[in-house]
Design a protein with these regions (language model features):
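Short acidic beta-strand-loop surface patches of small beta-rich interaction domains
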Residues: 56-69
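Active-site histidine-acidic residue metal-binding/catalytic motifs
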Residues: 97-199, 222-225
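Primarily a LysM-type cell-wall glycan-binding module
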Residues: 26-50
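Bacterial N-terminal signal peptides that target proteins for export
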Residues: 2-13
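Structural recognition of the beta-strand scaffold that forms the well-ordered cores
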Residues: 110-114, 157-161, 213-219, 233-236, ...
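Non-catalytic propeptide/linker segments at domain boundaries
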Residues: 72-115
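N-terminal signal peptide c-region/cleavage motif recognized by signal peptidases
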Residues: 21-23
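Active-site-adjacent mobile loop/cap segments within catalytic or ligand-binding domains
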Residues: 208-209, 222-225, 261-328
């Protein structure tokens, strides 16, 4: 084979490779033609696209293919935008930061997630042999897992208490530190200042997002006598009907899950009214969760086992999805 033939063959292979790549792209680009009398919104919905999310991009991709007021034209093939299928949240840690969007069940919902204590305040402390379990570390891990669940259903999530070094951890005994911040700001030692700081952070975000469904979720672990076992329970502010409904939906979902996975166990989680600082001072409807007694060895299994932390977060998220559906 002479040099000219080799060059020609390489050129043909490169051209073929380019055509193959183009073909693959073309194959993955979704197109469709409208049905008689079908409007733009119905066309998007029939093809599995959220109207408010994808309408503008659809119009941009199909410029000059519309009738009056963006009416669809029969016989015209319209191109659909690529769906966003992943979102990045670095606070979840290297292994979890890329979250796949599984569906749009929470599209339009905004959540402000606060894990209890943090920074100079570890919260309740339990001793297991030589190990110290700090409330803030376990509440933070469950909160991150909850954030991941909510993001996977296409919610908007603000993580208020943050530790850039931790991410979701799969250890039983979580290392303790004081690196947590409130949206990047140092957490004060004074309790009232600390609580007001996180309320201010939520309210500042809420100023620009208050037209939609917005909820605050605060996660803590309780500390009682070693012999006291408790189930997850939830607080809402006395005058907040929306906070009460959210709390009740979550507790109802937890009861359903425990009844299914542990028949005969029973579930005594409750919803109660409280005038706690963060419930009173955050403007969006809020729910305050206590996940169990950190001093009780059986309750601790709910926190020590990573699979249990994951399950609790997922079940809470399912209850939150139910509440969002009720708001529509």
């Amino acid at each position: 084979m002479n040099i000219s033939t080799k060059i020609l063959n390489r050129t043909l292979l490169l051209a073929l490779g380019t055509l193959m790549c183009t073909f693959v792209v073309a194959q993955t680009q979704h197109t469709d033609t409208p049905q008689q009398g079908e409007g733009l919104g119905a066309f998007l919905l029939r093809n599995g696209y959220n109207v408010s999310k994808y309408k503008d991009k659809f119009i941009e991709l199909n410029a000059n293919r519309f009738g009056k007021d963006y009416g669809l034209l029969l016989g015209v093939k319209y191109v659909f935008p690529d769906k966003q299928n992943q979102i990045e949240e670095p606070l979840l840690g290297e292994a979890n930061k890329m979250v796949t969007i599984e569906d749009d069940e929470l599209y339009g919902a905004t959540y402000y997630l606060i894990s209890g204590h943090g920074g100079p305040d570890p919260g309740a402390i339990a001793k297991v042999g030589e190990k110290e379990l700090h409330e803030d570390e376990y509440a933070y891990d469950v909160m991150l897992r909850l954030a991941k669940c909510l993001l996977s259903h296409n919610a908007k999530v603000h993580i208020i208490i943050q530790d850039p070094n931790d991410g979701i951890r799969d250890d039983a005994y979580l290392s303790n530190d004081d690196h947590e911040t409130c949206v990047g700001a140092a957490i004060p030692l004074d309790q009232n200042e600390r609580l007001q700081q996180r309320c201010d952070a939520v309210n500042n975000f809420y100023k620009t997002e208050r037209t939609g469904y917005c909820r605050t979720v605060i996660i803590h672990l309780d500390s009682r006598t070693e012999s006291t076992r408790i189930d997850v329970f939830a607080y809402h502010f006395t005058k907040s009907k929306m906070g009460q409904r959210l709390a009740q939906n979550v507790i109802d979902k937890l009861k359903t899950k425990y009844d299914y996975y542990q028949p005969g166990r029973g579930f005594l989680g409750e919803v109660k009214e409280r005038q706690l600082y963060v419930l009173r001072e955050t403007n969006p409807p809020a729910m305050f969760l206590e996940l169990g007694n950190i001093q009780n060895d059986k309750d601790r299994l709910r926190f020590i086992k990573p699979s249990n932390r994951k399950a609790v977060a997922e079940w809470v998220a399912e209850g939150m999805i139910e509440d969002f559906k009720m708001s529509k």
